[in-house]
């Protein structure tokens, strides 16, 4: 997640956002809880130790005046196992993470991700500060995938786009221009990205 402290304090540069996520909560269906507005004092919540997720959880419960017990672990698999074993009433992390971790539960269909989102989590590629060439390459790799989607270029049709009538598409797939030269790359670097990972 792109945060001010991570951007300013730990020597990293965030080059863009490729996914906006947000923190949510998962509960057991048989709890009858369908909204965070139903959370009561004494609730226990599993999450990862020392993360923005833990801080967001604290802020959420404090802002609602709900007393809670944090149940924290360093590793995501430990959090999932604890929640699955019933050591906490709810599990909180980014909603994409909840969806992915839910399938690891012993009975995935017995759990539901609640509709509320309590934070904005801009996710994207990160590089170390001080390497401006690598930063540019990573940024323009992200831009390549976004532009490929705008033009309808996929991993399946990327090669055929070399003969497009659109000059911008031809430049993007390396059939015209010298887009890679500024970074010391060959002209098909964008094409290889699209062929390997597709578009945005």
Task: Describe the predicted segments one by one.
Residues 27-33, 37-40, 49-51, 97-98, ...:
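Extended ligand-binding regions for polar small-molecule ligands
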Residues 70, 85, 108-109, 131-135:
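A residue-level marker of the well-folded mature domains of exported/periplasmic proteins
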């Amino acid at each position: 997640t792109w945060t001010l402290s991570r951007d300013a304090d730990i020597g990293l540069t965030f080059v863009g956002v490729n996914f906006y996520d947000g923190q949510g909560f998962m509960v057991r269906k048989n709890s009858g809880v369908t909204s965070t507005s139903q959370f009561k004092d004494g609730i226990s919540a599993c999450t990862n130790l020392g993360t923005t997720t833990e801080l967001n959880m604290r802020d959420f419960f404090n802002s609602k005046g709900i007393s809670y017990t944090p149940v924290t672990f360093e590793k995501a698999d430990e959090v999932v196992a604890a929640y699955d074993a019933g050591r906490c009433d709810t599990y909180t992390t980014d909603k994409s993470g909840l969806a992915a971790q839910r399938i690891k539960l012993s009975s995935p269909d017995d759990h539901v991700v609640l509709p509320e989102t309590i934070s904005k989590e801009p996710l994207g590629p990160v590089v170390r500060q001080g390497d401006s060439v690598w930063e540019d390459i990573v940024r323009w790799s992200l831009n390549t995938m976004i532009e490929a989607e705008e033009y309808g270029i996929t991993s399946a049709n990327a090669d055929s786009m070399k003969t497009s009538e659109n000059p911008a598409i031809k430049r993007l797939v390396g059939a015209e221009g010298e887009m890679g030269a500024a970074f010391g790359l060959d002209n098909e670097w964008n094409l290889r990205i699209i062929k390997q990972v597709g578009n945005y």
